[in-house]
Amino acid sequence: MRPVALLLLPSLLALLAHGLSLEAPTVGKGQAPGIEETDGELTAAPTPEQPERGVHFVTTAPTLKLLNHHPLLEEFLQEGLEKGDEELRPALPFQPDPPAPFTPSPLPRLANQDSRPVFTSPTPAMAAVPTQPQSKEGPWSPESESPMLRITAPLPPGPSMAVPTLGPGEIASTTPPSRAWTPTQEGPGDMGRPWVAEVVSQGAGIGIQGTITSSTASGDDEETTTTTTIITTTITTVQTPGPCSWNFSGPEGSLDSPTDLSSPTDVGLDCFFYISVYPGYGVEIKVQNISLREGETVTVEGLGGPDPLPLANQSFLLRGQVIRSPTHQAALRFQSLPPPAGPGTFHFHYQAYLLSCHFPRRPAYGDVTVTSLHPGGSARFHCATGYQLKGARHLTCLNATQPFWDSKEPVCIAACGGVIRNATTGRIVSPGFPGNYSNNLTCHWLLEAPEGQRLHLHFEKVSLAEDDDRLIIRNGDNVEAPPVYDSYEVEYLPIEGLLSSGKHFFVELSTDSSGAAAGMALRYEAFQQGHCYEPFVKYGNFSSSTPTYPVGTTVEFSCDPGYTLEQGSIIIECVDPHDPQWNETEPACRAVCSGEITDSAGVVLSPNWPEPYGRGQDCIWGVHVEEDKRIMLDIRVLRIGPGDVLTFYDGDDLTARVLGQYSGPRSHFKLFTSMADVTIQFQSDPGTSVLGYQQGFVIHFFEVPRNDTCPELPEIPNGWKSPSQPELVHGTVVTYQCYPGYQVVGSSVLMCQWDLTWSEDLPSCQRVTSCHDPGDVEHSRRLISSPKFPVGATVQYICDQGFVLMGSSILTCHDRQAGSPKWSDRAPKCLLEQLKPCHGLSAPENGARSPEKQLHPAGATIHFSCAPGYVLKGQASIKCVPGHPSHWSDPPPICRAASLDGFYNSRSLDVAKAPAASSTLDAAHIAAAIFLPLVAMVLLVGGVYFYFSRLQGKSSLQLPRPRPRPYNRITIESAFDNPTYETGSLSFAGDERI
């Protein structure tokens, strides 16, 4: 077996050069120990004999030299070099001849680093894969291995990157990584998971398996142990947009567009440039030059966070532009067009810059001072007098992937009680001041002046609820000391303040369970024996003749802008050598309601600012400057109630023009007057609730040069302006017009307003690239090629049936060099088609026609009728049908006489067979001609029958006799006494003869 071992020695040395471990594990049950089955693949894992541990790194790269490099990083670098158990990290496939040096980075232990992702590129490594003992496999030589390999191995964690040492025939991967892959540092949960890197070649898929067999013999070759290492080569074919991907880790370098590709491609490029600098530094990219073709894109993103941060794209990347990534990683992606267009070009330069902490938040009722925002810088906090700092007083900016402060910003609070030793000057305030205090409080403050000095208390504000809340100030150091002020006993505050007989004051504040108010604010000053105390004026200043205020010192007071001096003398003096004291009380500065101001600059405040103003107030201020000047009003604070009104008048009384009238809160704004005077009126709602602290208004005013004109308007390209008058005073109108071929975009008419600003923004002239809509044509429809009518668009008109097109049926939009695009012709018209008329028809005999005309136009209708006793035979209405020539729809009708015999003769009923569409007049005539004779005949026969049957009492069947009837002579003796009849005379009755 020794000859076989000698033959395998070169192969073993080659494998060791690639980092393969040939320790023979114990084989059992078809699988070597230390191998885990994960998704069908063999993955190496730590064994009990070789526990998992961290790997330390060393580097031969020079220390990062930057102008703002912090020494904190140098300690981390030196610490990494001094460790003795460090190993080299396996290499990463890298593009040959990179634009910038590719060096490994040390792994510093940064503050709070475990919770922040750090950029790490995966690097490949090799590992031995134990298999089943095999003794019949022949020896394997490196020559049988394909030069294109896919190698999988465990990778120790860490952010370092190194250039690989490639074997003969191997090439670095140029396959761009997946877009969804974001390189991040492994956290504690990822320490045992291997990284996988690939060396991939584009070609046909081929699988090659090589076997390495080593044998050892003990004794007389009685026992043989064989270890076989199998390396599987997988060559995949990936059709990618283009072979370009680079990684950069130096402090600065250049990014150039790919120009000389190793292999041609028939699709566009999709290139990635990954940049990583030291944690604690950001990436700054400057555009040196860029020239892209239409359709190409360049995007820049910041990496290292939960999601990529878009920074810029090709529309933002202009020459000289600087883009900064807020993290220490950045990625640039370039996508180009396929041949034959060819890719565009660009040249970028990147460098690392030191990241900084955010500016710390200033505490309310306090301030902050910052030495530097870079790592190592500090921030110091302090509170206003009367407030105590809660939290760290000093913060330090720590270096990390994203620098941060070592603690949260503190806050300033008003404590409930406390002991103040060596009290010289300061304030004590109730908890929550200037807001309301809490219920059920019992606070005690002990003030102690330096030895040999006394204390003076000044009441800045005392506001207690009208119940059992109480403030007591005692002239001593305990609760048993005699009180010098008790809110239960004193209704008004002492304007002159309080003086202690010794060096102590004891202040007690107690509140009950109901009601709350703003509380108190007391200012204290310590002063020496034989001197007066230091005076104080709220919202004002003073100047003194001697800083220690001995007897004879004079002090002069003044108020801040917007405040007025009240209830005191402007000048006071320290008198009485035996018991030094001021001859007058200190004055007070208050924001008053109303006033006349003649200063060139000043402030107008709401009444009692910053305290709440009162209800139902009506205040008027007059501001006056020189006649040739004007006033600018800068309204910086406006927080009033919805029922309150603040009005500005452009003049010296309330009848002037109103500049503006406002209610409710409003942000910062300015007003300008056209006069040398302005009147300000404030009216508060008498029924509204009082607002809180700093609710009101703050108005700064300034005297400005007279300016009765609006700013001069510039000319616009491809157009001109026409003012209504030479001077641009209020009311002036300026009209803008464009040259032929251009149109106005925006408002063409601008007016100078009262505030001396223009009513609209400046317009522009834009090139006209389309024709106007030619409109619709009556009695037609149109077909358009483009709805916006650009140059070259067409419009076709088609007339409705019965109408004839007059003009061009197709209009085309043509461009003109000296004007706007114009249609090739005017819009056509659709006129009614002209047809020959029908000749007039004569009226039928015994009939009439309507209308009576000789010619009738196409579509006209003629109506016929007959005289009484005649019946119309034919159509009562006929129409002139359009045509070439036009003709009548039916022949003309005739009128026939109506007879009784014809009524019984069916042939005479032709008129009755006329269509129901005949006129109502003809039907009435026919009915009358038939039924009236019948009715007359019936009446005649009935009358005769009635006469003979009723009046004569005879049967209707008896006929009169032809001879006269005999009669007897009537004598005189008869009883007939009718004087009408006499003897021998004749009388007639009815139709009979007597």
Curated annotation (Swiss-Prot):
Can you tell me which residues are glycosylated?
289, 399, 436, 541
In its UniProt entry, what is this protein called?
Seizure protein 6 homolog
Which intervals hold domain Sushi?
A: 355-414, 530-591, 708-767, 769-832, 836-897
Residue ranges in the Extracellular topological domain are 20-925
A biological process term (GO) from this entry: excitatory postsynaptic potential
Protein family per UniProt: Belongs to the SEZ6 family.
PTM statement from Swiss-Prot or TrEMBL: Glycosylated.
* Region listing for Disordered, in residue ranges: 28-50, 88-146, 171-191, 241-261
This protein's superkingdom? Eukaryota
Compositionally biased, Pro residues: which spans? 93-107
Q: Which residue spans belong to the Cytoplasmic compartment?
A: 947-994
**Function comment:** May play a role in cell-cell recognition and in neuronal membrane signaling. Seems to be important for the achievement of the necessary balance between dendrite elongation and branching during the elaboration of a complex dendritic arbor. Involved in the development of appropriate excitatory synaptic connectivity.
Annotated GO CC locations: apical dendrite; dendritic shaft; dendritic spine; endoplasmic reticulum; neuronal cell body; perinuclear region of cytoplasm; plasma membrane
Q: Which residues form the signal peptide?
A: 1-19
Disulfide bond annotation, renumbered to this chain: 357-397, 383-412, 416-443, 532-574, 559-589, 593-619, 710-752, 738-765, 771-813, 799-830, 838-880, 866-895
Annotated ranges, domain CUB: 416-527, 593-704
What InterPro entries would the database entry show?
CUB_dom, SEZ6_CSMD_C4BPB_Regulators, Sperma_CUB_dom_sf, Sushi/SCR/CCP_sf, Sushi_SCR_CCP_dom
The annotated topology with respect to the bilayer is: Single-pass type I membrane protein
Q: What spans are recorded as compositionally biased (Polar residues)?
A: 112-123, 172-185
Annotated stretches, region: O-glycosylated at two sites: 38-47, 59-63
Transmembrane stretches, by residue range? 926-946
Could you list this entry's UniProt keywords, alphabetically sorted.
Answer: Cell membrane, Disulfide bond, Glycoprotein, Membrane, Repeat, Signal, Sushi, Transmembrane, Transmembrane helix
Q: Which organism is it from?
A: Homo sapiens (Human)
Provide the protein's localization.
Answer: Cell membrane
